[in-house]
Structures are given as C-alpha cells and as structure tokens.
C-alpha cells in the first residue's frame, strides 16, 4: 500500500 501513512 503506497499511501500517506504517518508513523506516529
């Protein structure tokens, strides 16, 4: 999945 997923 290449979507904006913040690692916080």
Swiss-Prot record:
GO CC annotation, single: extracellular region
Subcellular location field: Secreted
The domain of life is Eukaryota
| Tissue specificity statement from the Swiss-Prot or TrEMBL entry | In larvae, expressed in the ring gland but not in midgut, CNS, thoracic perisympathetic organs (tPSO) and abdominal perisympathetic organs (aPSO) (at protein level). In adults, expressed in corpora cardiaca and corpora allata but not in brain and thoracic-abdominal ganglion (at protein level).
Sites of the modification Tryptophan amide? 8
Q: Would the keyword Secreted be found if you checked this record's keyword annotation?
A: yes
Its chief place of residence is: secreted
List, in alphabetical order, the Gene Ontology terms for molecular function in this entry. Answer: hormone activity
A Gene Ontology biological process term: neuropeptide signaling pathway
- Residues that bear Pyrrolidone carboxylic acid: 1
Mind listing the UniProt keywords for this protein, alphabetically?
A: Amidation, Hormone, Neuropeptide, Pyrrolidone carboxylic acid, Secreted
Explain the purpose of this protein: Probably causes a marked increase in hemolymph carbohydrate.
Family affiliation: Belongs to the AKH/HRTH/RPCH family.
Q: What is this protein called?
A: Adipokinetic hormone
Q: What is the lineage of its organism?
A: Eukaryota, Metazoa, Ecdysozoa, Arthropoda, Hexapoda
């Amino acid at each position: 999945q290449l979507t904006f997923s913040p690692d916080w």
